Amino acid sequence: MIVVTGGAGFIGANLVKALNARGREDVLVVDDLSDGTKFVNLADCTLGDYLDKDDFLARVKAELRGEPSELPPIEAIFHEGACSDTTEWDGKFMLENNFEYSKVLLHFCQYKRIPFLYASSAATYGGSEVFVEAPEHEKPLNVYGYSKLLFDQYVRVHWESFDAQVVGFRYFNVYGPREQHKGKMASVAYHHHSQVKRGENPKLFGAWDGYEAGMQSRDFVYVGDVVDVNLWCLDHPEVSGIFNLGTGRAEPFKAIAETVIDYYATGKIDYIDFPEELKGRYQSYTRADISRLREAGYKAEFKTVREGVSAYLDWLNG
């Protein structure tokens, strides 16, 4: 079986759907469905099994102790499960979910000598102006970013002891299908779609941090492209490392709003004051340096904002 933790979530559910498209139905999804609305992300997928994240962790720990675990044979783990709320400041909760849990799965994969492909984050860079996978550029602005950095550091420290593939993906701003459950943490593209559907105008932050209104820029990457990179790495077990996963381009938030307005042929951008609570904790600019990913052999192109958002809107209206 292939395990996808966070498999009912945004990137995880897209991975499950893509594995199904490859003919893989032996997928074990691990998640927490306390928020039952997430089931819709898996409603059109085929699963081999489902386990609650706490039950799965207990079985993994039992296996590591040499005890009976009732786990099926596992050939790879995609570890997408995490608390991804950048406004969450409970550090104990964040480290339990994003650091301690990840450590156990990492050691399990090494024990079984199977691939471990996990979600890191561009939040590890925080206030940096350079987005290269190196410690001198890692300056997280929130405890979420720190929890992801802490695990990346753990991986680096133990790197020489690994016998099986380990790949960390520093996701930049991912958007696309199956993210509706994320609420306020869903992408700007999703929020702009929702605003227009309610008869409102798309809203963006006004001028701030030296940027004109709507011109704060991020590396926006379509979830389908993210899934393609994950699966490419699974297909290339010789590839290991921590890689930025973005497009290599920075595009302004305004480009998303304009794409949504053009798609629906209605509305204009409303600019709002930059929130006080985000000042000093907000990345006004990101652009993934994807040199390391390219050097590893990944050649496929990434969608532009206009291409990706248009495809996303087609899906939302399908």
Swiss-Prot record:
Pfam families: Epimerase (PF01370). Substrate binds at residues 173, 184, 191, 205-208, 218, 282. It is an enzyme of class 5 (isomerase). Pathway: Nucleotide-sugar biosynthesis; ADP-L-glycero-beta-D-manno-heptose biosynthesis; ADP-L-glycero-beta-D-manno-heptose from D-glycero-beta-D-manno-heptose 7-phosphate: step 4/4. Keywords: Carbohydrate metabolism, Isomerase, NADP. InterPro entries: Epimerase_deHydtase (IPR001509), Heptose_epim (IPR011912), NAD(P)-bd_dom_sf (IPR036291). GO terms for biological process: ADP-L-glycero-beta-D-manno-heptose biosynthetic process; carbohydrate metabolic process. The keyword Isomerase applies. Its EC number is 5.1.3.20. GO terms for molecular function: ADP-glyceromanno-heptose 6-epimerase activity; NADP binding. Signal peptide: none annotated. NADP(+) binds at residues 10-11, 31-32, 38, 53, 80-84, 97, 148, 174, 182. The active site is at residues 144, 182. Its cofactor is NADP(+). The keyword Isomerase applies. Binds 1 NADP(+) per subunit. Gene3D superfamilies: NAD(P)-binding Rossmann-like Domain (3.40.50.720), UDP-galactose 4-epimerase, domain 1 (3.90.25.10). It catalyses: ADP-D-glycero-beta-D-manno-heptose = ADP-L-glycero-beta-D-manno-heptose. Belongs to the NAD(P)-dependent epimerase/dehydratase family. HldD subfamily. Contains a large N-terminal NADP-binding domain, and a smaller C-terminal substrate-binding domain. Catalyzes the interconversion between ADP-D-glycero-beta-D-manno-heptose and ADP-L-glycero-beta-D-manno-heptose via an epimerization at carbon 6 of the heptose. Homopentamer. This is ADP-L-glycero-D-manno-heptose-6-epimerase. It comes from Chromohalobacter salexigens (strain ATCC BAA-138 / DSM 3043 / CIP 106854 / NCIMB 13768 / 1H11). The gene is hldD.
